[in-house]
Structures are given as C-alpha cells and as structure tokens.
Amino acid sequence: MKAVIAKNEEQLKDAFYVREEVFVKEQNVPAEEEIDELENESEHIVVYDGEKPVGAGRWRMKDGYGKLERICVLKSHRSAGVGGIIMKALEKAAADGGASGFILNAQTQAVPFYKKHGYRVLSEKEFLDAGIPHLQMMKD
C-alpha cells in the first residue's frame, strides 16, 4: 500500500470516493456537508492498495498547525495499517508545509486510534459535527 498526495483530478476523485463510502454511505453524513468550501485550500492524501483507493485524508494550515481532516479508511481495509499510513503521510506533508504541530477533531470512537499515534485530547467537552460526537485532539 502506498500514500500519495493528490496531484490531479483522478487522485482527488479517488479521495472523494473513499470519503463518500465512509462518511456519506456508512455514517450517513449529508453529502453537501462532506464536500465543503475548504477542499481547494487543503492538500489531499490517498492511500492505494494496488490501483484501488482504500484510504484518504486532507490537511490545511490553521494558526501555524496542520489541521488534519476527513481521515477515513474503507471498511474492507480497516485494521490493516491504512490509518497509520494516512497519519504519517498527512503529518509529513503538514510538517513539510511548515506546521509546528497537528490538530484534529476526532470522532469519539476513533480517539484510541489517535492516542496510539501520539495525540492527546485537548478538552473532554464533546461537540457534534454532522451529528457525530467529536473531541479536539493535538500532537506537538
């Protein structure tokens, strides 16, 4: 499996495909909320298993930090290391882009995954994003 920075329309479509499968179809996030106004200012990562897109994420600069967003893995490839590949690729891209650390809003069910990757919860106060409970997390 390999992670690539989406550099063309086809790779961007692959990222959106994974996001639609996970967030829209599996988690019932409205499609109009999933694709947002931040797409063009974000750098997108796609993980491929051969030619098949199986994971995705994006990052953008926010207040000097890399804000990691839309991290997702197809159900068929969970527990296969794809999430870790996405995290490493996003963190490297953000660091290369000048980020001094990383922040993200984690679905509460995914908090243990992010803790394994060195993130800490900033506040135990949950908030809803697209109707799903989240916690803000950070890694210096």
UniProtKB/Swiss-Prot annotation:
Pfam families: Acetyltransf_10 (PF13673)
The keyword Acyltransferase belongs to this UniProt entry's keyword annotation: yes
Taxonomic source organism: Bacillus subtilis (strain 168)
UniProt record similarity statement: Belongs to the acetyltransferase family.
GO MF annotations, alphabetized: N-acetyltransferase activity
CDD domains found in the cross-reference section: NAT_SF (cd04301)
Name recorded for this polypeptide: Uncharacterized N-acetyltransferase YjcF
Domain of life: Bacteria
Taxonomic lineage of the native organism: Bacteria, Bacillati, Bacillota, Bacilli, Bacillales
InterPro entries per UniProt: Acyl_CoA_acyltransferase, GNAT_dom, GNPNAT1-like
Record-linked PROSITE patterns: GNAT
EC numbers: 2.3.1.-
Keyword entries, A-Z: Acyltransferase, Transferase
Domain N-acetyltransferase, chain residue ranges per copy: 2-140
